[in-house]
Structures are given as structure tokens and as C-alpha cells.
């Protein structure tokens, strides 16, 4: 979380296209998570699981149970997306603790991309549950005059997802930087603990909101089907 790593936003450019430090860190996180996932599944064992395997199984089981509480009938479908969001955002939030690294989630373009992925996934799961004709019809029910309000709601909650995560992580890093500049390294442990706690909370909130939005589209279809069958 050093000053050089935090302020060196633009790393280099390729053909005039700027490659920022958040892009480099995002690539590093994705490659690292891929290697970790591959190494865990490659050496996994049912009879003699390693400590590393048990750790990952515990993390994934916790996320699986959390999703199951919200969408018990669709957990297998939703789990890969929401679990990936949780893990990626958590690592992205925490990596800023390491000197020389920049938290990608302190970059609005990264959080906007994550929010857009969530926006698209909500509609994809909704269309998968209802079919695209029925799904699009709910925007004009009970009256077509509600269409603008539905669209504003979809856009505003997507923007809120992006800005909330960006604002919290950016303010956290700025606060930590200011405190370290004033007090030096006399208070590194409280700042580190604050960063870790906030990183976990923000990753959890983002993933839960994405899960709730997805559940809203799927469960609306299920409630409609139950009402028609009565």
C-alpha cells in the first residue's frame, strides 16, 4: 500500500493504448487464481485431503450455503458466477495491502465492468428462467407507462454497484495513505486490520447484491408460475 504503488496509476502503453496498474494487477490476480484453482483440483483427494484443499473446500462450502439460502432451487446454476465475483473482488480489495500493488477495485473502470457483468447476468438468468419474450414483457406490466421507471431502476442500481465499491476502496486507500504519511509506520497494524475488514465486507456486499438481483428476476418468474397454477 506504498505511495509509489498507489500513485503509479499508468504503467506503460502499447500502441498508444495506456495499460494502467489496475489492469496489470487484474491480470496478475486472474492468473494467480487460475493457478491456485488448477493446483487445488489437480492434487485433490477424497481420502487424504491436504490442508490447502480443506481450506478451499471450507471457503467454497460457505459460499455455496449462502447462495443456497437465497436460491435453493438454482444454487448449482448461480454458484459459479457469484462465487467467482466474491473471490475476485475480495482478492482485488486485499491486494492493495501489499506494497507496490494497486487495488483494481479502487479504479472506477474495473468496478463499472464488474457492475456491468452483474447487470448482464441478471438479465441472462431471467431470460433463461422465463424466455426472452416473457422476460421483456415484465417491463411493461402492469402498464407500459412503467417502462421508463423500470429502465431507470436497472441503470441506477448498476451505477450504485460500481460507485459503492469504487468509493469505499478508494477512500480506504486514501485514508491509509494519509495516515501513513502523517504517522509513518507507527500505526500500521490498525490500518492493516481496517483494510482487511473493509475488503471482506465490501466483497460480501457486492456479491450479495448481485445474488439478490439475480434472485429477484428468477423468483418473479416462479411466483408468476405459481399464481397461474392456483
Curated annotation (Swiss-Prot):
PROSITE patterns: ATPASE_A (PS00449). It is found in: Cell inner membrane. Gene3D superfamilies: ATP synthase, F0 complex, subunit A (1.20.120.220). One of its GO terms (molecular function) is proton-transporting ATP synthase activity, rotational mechanism. Belongs to the ATPase A chain family. NCBIfam families: ATP_synt_6_or_A (TIGR01131), PRK13420.1 (NF009954). This is ATP synthase subunit a. The lineage of its organism: Bacteria, Pseudomonadati, Pseudomonadota, Gammaproteobacteria, Legionellales. The gene is atpB.
Amino acid at each position: 500500500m506504498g505511495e509509489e504503488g498507489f500513485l503509479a496509476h499508468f504503467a506503460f502503453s502499447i500502441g498508444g493504448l495506456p495499460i494502467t496498474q489496475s489492469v496489470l494487477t487484474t491480470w496478475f490476480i486472474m492468473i494467480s487464481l487460475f493457478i491456485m484453482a488448477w493446483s487445488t483440483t489437480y492434487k485433490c483427494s477424497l481420502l487424504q485431503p491436504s490442508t490447502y484443499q480443506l481450506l478451499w473446500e471450507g471457503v467454497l462450502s460457505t459460499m455455496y450455503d449462502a447462495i443456497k439460502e437465497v436460491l435453493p432451487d438454482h444454487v448449482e446454476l448461480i454458484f459459479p458466477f457469484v462465487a467467482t465475483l466474491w473471490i475476485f473482488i475480495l482478492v482485488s480489495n486485499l491486494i492493495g495491502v501489499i506494497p507496490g500493488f494497486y487495488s483494481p477495485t479502487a479504479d472506477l473502470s474495473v468496478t463499472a465492468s464488474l457492475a456491468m457483468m452483474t447487470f448482464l447476468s441478471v438479465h441472462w438468468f431471467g431470460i433463461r428462467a422465463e424466455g426472452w419474450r416473457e422476460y421483456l414483457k415484465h417491463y411493461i406490466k402492469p402498464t407500459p407507462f412503467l417502462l421508463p421507471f423500470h429502465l431507470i431502476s436497472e441503470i441506477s442500481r448498476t451505477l450504485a454497484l460500481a460507485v459503492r465499491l469504487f468509493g469505499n476502496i478508494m477512500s480506504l486507500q486514501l485514508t491509509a495513505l494519509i495516515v501513513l504519511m502523517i504517522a509513518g509506520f507507527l500505526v500500521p497494524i490498525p490500518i492493516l486490520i481496517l483494510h482487511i475488514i473493509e475488503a471482506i465486507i465490501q466483497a460480501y456486499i457486492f456479491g450479495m447484491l448481485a445474488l439478490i438481483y439475480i434472485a429477484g428476476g428468477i423468483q418473479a418468474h416462479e411466483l408468476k408460475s405459481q399464481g397461474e397454477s392456483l
